[in-house]
Amino acid sequence: MTRALIPGSFDPVTFGHLDVIERTARLFDEVLVAVVENPHKSTVFTVVERTEMLAEVTAHLPNLKVDEFDGLLVDYALDRGVTAIVKGLRAVSDFEYELQMAQLNYRLSGIETLFMPTTPEYSFLSSSLVREVARFGGDVSSMVPTPVAARLQARFGR
């Protein structure tokens, strides 16, 4: 059985994230989406809220589980029998950082990292961009699923 791990902060989850998640779910028997709790990073939504949003918008994927974690990614992966870590790439600029992380993770655990380029229509999209648009009352409905857009609107009061 193959098991993939897709880690991220998902603050908030975007259609770009869902693109990578859904495509990964077609390739692996099981997929774990791990929402990172990073105390050094300021987030709009708590780890619990981000986990709830992801679970809601991925409920249609029967081979997927959403979880939260903090600590070393490879320890989490090894504890769960992960076959591969999957990372979405939007642009070459993402690759430079992700390659270093993939090499470190492999050295620490022997777990491979697979890079999945986003579909071109989402290559511009990032959670930080979505947060910025939402913060100023812009329409994010083409960037995030409806339940996420509603939570952003409630959070920023616009």
Question: Each predicted region: which residue ranges?
Answer:
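Nucleotidyltransferase catalytic core that binds NTPs
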Residues: 1-158
